[in-house]
């Protein structure tokens, strides 16, 4: 699910590739994989055709400044065309020094109840209660279905929690 056609179509291409990576002779010069990789969806707020399910949630509070720097690097997307499409251009600060605070308010949300539940699964209730910002992922049904141990290996920040 996504608002941008390029993102939706890329998602379909990845789903198609998720199956084909293990099929011999699709790309004769490349060995097919013996085990399908794990494919993940990034969190969205769309409900149709399928609502997002936060199978994995990661506390990004310690690195929120890096996330904001990454978003801030996409000037035209976050300060021009998304505000234009959403008809909130006047909310975008003219002063670039205020851009990251604007992004934090407009583009980074607190964990919703479903994400909070996933945080509790991966971090425990006490630690999850302290999370200010999180990113969540859904396991794609077209790839390998990882065990909890495999998820913790893929997301080392979840180890020991």
Please annotate each region the language model reported.
Residues 12-16, 37-40, 65-69:
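Internal, well-ordered alpha-helical scaffold/interface segments
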Residues 1-27, 52:
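Active-site beta-strand->loop->alpha-helix modules in alpha/beta enzyme cores, enriched
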Residues 41-44, 60-62:
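Short, structured patches in soluble enzyme cores that scaffold and shape functional sites
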Residues 43-45, 51-52:
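A long, hydrophobic alpha-helical segment
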Residues 23, 33-37, 41-42:
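Active-site cores that bind ATP or allylic diphosphates and position pyrophosphate for catalysis
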Residues 19-23, 45, 76:
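Alpha-helix capping at helix-to-loop junctions
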Residues 27-28, 35, 49-50, 56-161:
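C-terminal accessory domains and tails appended to enzymatic cores
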């Amino acid at each position: 699910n996504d608002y941008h056609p390029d993102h939706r179509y890329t998602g379909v291409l990845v789903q198609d590739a998720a199956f084909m990576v293990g099929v011999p002779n699709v790309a004769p010069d490349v060995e097919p994989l013996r085990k399908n990789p794990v494919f993940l969806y990034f969190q969205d707020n769309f409900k149709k055709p399928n609502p997002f399910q936060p199978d994995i949630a990661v506390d990004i509070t310690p690195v929120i400044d890096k996330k904001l720097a990454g978003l801030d690097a996409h000037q035209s997307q976050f300060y021009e065309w998304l505000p234009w499409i959403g008809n909130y251009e006047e909310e975008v600060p003219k002063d670039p020094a205020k851009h990251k605070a604007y992004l934090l308010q407009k583009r980074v949300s607190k964990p919703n109840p479903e994400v909070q539940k996933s945080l509790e699964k991966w971090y425990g209730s006490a630690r999850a209660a302290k999370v200010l910002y999180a990113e969540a992922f859904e396991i794609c049904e077209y790839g390998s279905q990882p065990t909890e141990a495999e998820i913790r290996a893929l997301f080392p920040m979840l180890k020991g929690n």
